[in-house]
Amino acid sequence: VEDKPANNVLLVGARGTGKSSGVKAVVNSFFDKGLRLVQLTKEQLIDLPVIMEHLRDFSSKKFIIFLDDLSFEEFEVEYKYLKSAIEGGASAKPENVLIYATSNRRHLIKESYKDRGANDDDMHRSDTLNETISLSDRFGLIIYYMAPNQQEYLDIVDGLLKQHGIELSKEELRVKAGAWEKEHSGRSGRIAQQFVTHYLGQVYNK
């Protein structure tokens, strides 16, 4: 937004740790400065060059092309369009466009045991493997989102509850919020928010 050089960004972390929310919060924070979000699915990556050229015409705006929960199976080739776009391809990426992607794994392309096999008859297997693993390295900035530990999770729940004027004792917070995360998919900001929503529903129904 300040017309300075900036890197494409890959946000890596477990589910519910706030990767997507973080990207959307950035766009909301700088909306008044002309920042806009264009969200694509991986199936739309084939159209990425055309989309970027279209965005180039809106030079007064800045765009984040957002790819949420991105990963590829070994047989999918859409990653080639993304790699080409990041590296410049036939035409340079517009100066008003950056690519942000979120993923649950550091290497975006699933690697099979066959890819590692020494007896594979594909003489270019090593080059192919390096190409797929290196996709994430094409992002200039990689940000890791770590799942919260037990105390951090409880602090998140406590903070969310206090926003609604509710304060639980440390023991009640530990028991109730702890039971909730054990019944669900572990500790994360999303799980904390879901517990608070559930708890508020119980309180308001009384």
Residue positions per predicted region:
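Pre-Walker A adenine-sensing motif
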Residues: 1-3
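Walker A/P-loop nucleotide-binding motif
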Residues: 5-24
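Loop/turn-to-beta-strand initiation segments
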Residues: 7, 35-36, 60-64, 93-100
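Switch/connector loops and helix/strand junctions flanking conserved nucleotide-binding motifs
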Residues: 19, 48, 74, 107-112, ...
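AAA+/P-loop NTPase substrate/partner-engagement loops
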Residues: 29-63, 70-75
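Conserved catalytic/switch belt of AAA+ P-loop NTPases
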Residues: 57, 74-121
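Conserved AAA+ ATPase "SRH/arginine-finger" region at the nucleotide-binding site
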Residues: 120-133, 140-154
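C-terminal alpha-helical "lid" subdomain
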Residues: 146-206
